[in-house]
Curated annotation (Swiss-Prot):
Any one GO CC term of the record: small ribosomal subunit
Any GO molecular function: structural constituent of ribosome
Keyword Hydrolase appears in the UniProt entry: no
Record protein name field: Small ribosomal subunit protein uS2
Length: 225
């Protein structure tokens, strides 16, 4: 049986605060005294904080700064915190009932490795409409919870999971809408290294919470060039 559906992220904050403009040398950080899953330098090196030059009202609460070139920068502390929250949520589910999906090229290998590490179900590449809603389709699967790499690229999965009441965890960039997302992980969801780091951390944290072995290095999750 599926866990109770988490509180949805379907509405952004009523008011959007002005976002400070980033000057040279400034970058996202975590609060003093807090401990991140990996060092801030590792997050920065992977480009997890790098957003796009577009932003949505939904994602503004996760924006740290906007650079002088118009690029929105995500708050690494929020990313780190949301990975922990998502891992805790996922740890309560039977892995065989968890579905991870990615249509994005650079998300497919990390999602595949996440699935392998935790023994979850994965659907990678082009998603055939009806796989979550039509029992007559070959490969039909009704998960208890879904992880999507990009709400835009995985829009059909998002639509079907939402229609059957399945909770959705999504990796969301600054340009994403989150209307059908139940738990947002704010991150660069287009970069090769960013996606590998987020999926690796998520898998590692779920394994830790479930007290199961995790024998994978970050490089195992990186899409080969």
């Amino acid at each position: 049986m599926a866990e109770a559906k988490p509180a949805p992220e379907k509405e952004a904050a009523a008011k959007t605060e002005s976002v400070p403009v980033e000057t040279e040398g400034e970058g996202p950080s975590v609060k003093e005294g807090s401990t991140s899953l990996v060092s801030i330098d590792e997050y920065l090196a992977a480009g997890v904080h790098i957003g796009t030059q577009q932003k949505t009202q939904d994602m503004m609460r996760f924006v740290y700064r906007v650079r002088t070139d118009g690029l929105y920068v995500l708050d690494i502390q929020s990313t780190d915190e949301r990975i922990r929250v998502a891992a805790k949520l996922l740890s309560h589910y039977d892995p065989s009932r968890i579905l991870v999906v990615s249509s994005r090229q650079y998300g497919q290998h990390p999602a595949r490795m996440f699935s392998r590490a935790l023994s979850t179900k994965s659907m990678l590449g082009r998603f055939i409409p009806g796989l979550l809603t039509n029992p007559q389709i070959h490969g039909f699967f009704e998960p208890d919870i879904v992880i999507v790499t990009d709400p835009a690229g995985d829009a059909q999965v998002l639509k079907e999971a939402s229609s059957i009441g399945v909770p959705i965890v999504a990796l969301c960039d600054t340009n994403n809408l989150t209307s059908n997302v139940d738990l947002v992980i704010p991150t660069n969801n287009k970069g090769r290294k960013a996606l590998s780091l987020v999926y690796w951390l998520l898998a590692r944290e779920v394994s830790r919470l479930n007290s199961t072995p995790f024998n994978y290095e970050l490089t195992d999750f990186e899409t080969p060039l």
